[in-house]
Amino acid sequence: MSYITFKSKLIEQKVKQYLKKKHADLLVKEGRRVLVKEEGALLITKMLIHNDDLQSEDLADLQMFPNIKELQLLSENITDLESLPPLEKLQKLYLNVKATDYTPLVKCKKLKKVEVYDSGVSDIAPFCELTKLKELKLSCNKLISLEGIQRLQNLTELWLDRNQITDIFPLAWLPNLEYLQLERNQISDLSPLRALKKLITLRLYHNEVKDLSPLKHLFLEELDLEQNKIEDLSDLVGIETLRNLKICFNPIKDASPLLKMPYLEFVCTDAEDIYLPLERYLGKIVVREVFGGQYPNFQEADTYIFSKKE
């Protein structure tokens, strides 16, 4: 009978915990030791390790689990991904580590969902090799350039918030995008988004946007424009699919375009000269002040939510 030889104590512990609950017959006790039969490795399809004791070299043990489909690794002591084996069935990957080179991820060719959060990613190139990706989340990193991302033609969901991005031109070549998160960058030009006809949700909170004309022919349902430099909302009037709109903290000079958008179900604004006309002329809109609470992201006392009456 063959047993698994572990090098990583953490991975060994995770495997034994799983098998003890569901496949205890694959654990064999010899004296004070508990051994894992080799066939037990084939039953591991998901592994989640959130522990700073996990080291870079521990990743080599993952080669014994060829059926892993989902992997989550959170550790400040993973600084190198070179030991990550080519997991041929891996489809979902979440990393919160301190690596500097993400090139080893290209060994996992079947990845469909990848999230690398707050991990110092400065080069998007390795992710552009993962052409089967449908969801890519690179929030809170150090990205400046998006060049190469146009190769990811299957992407439907993309998170790039809290980076250092100014130019989004490569996004023009991602026709299947439905959800785009670009909060807290330095983006001013939205023209590359004109071609994204499948885009439903767009989040642009805390950027440098002034011109909304590139959005006028899209079919957006949810749009977050808070904390930009927007003065004119008239380009939004023709987006009849739009239901949720956030426009707080913009120097908006004229609220009248909103009165031509009766299809809106939710509007967030901080300006009295905007919410009063809405309240007066659109009877289906109800106003509620927000002081945190139900909407904890809104801390300012002069923020108002408008939502469609039942």
Segments and roles (model prediction):
Residues 1, 309-310:
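Short intrinsically disordered terminal tails
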Residues 1-2, 95:
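Extreme N-terminus of proteins, especially the signal/transit-peptide cleavage junction
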Residues 2-64, 296-303:
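LRR flanking "cap" motifs
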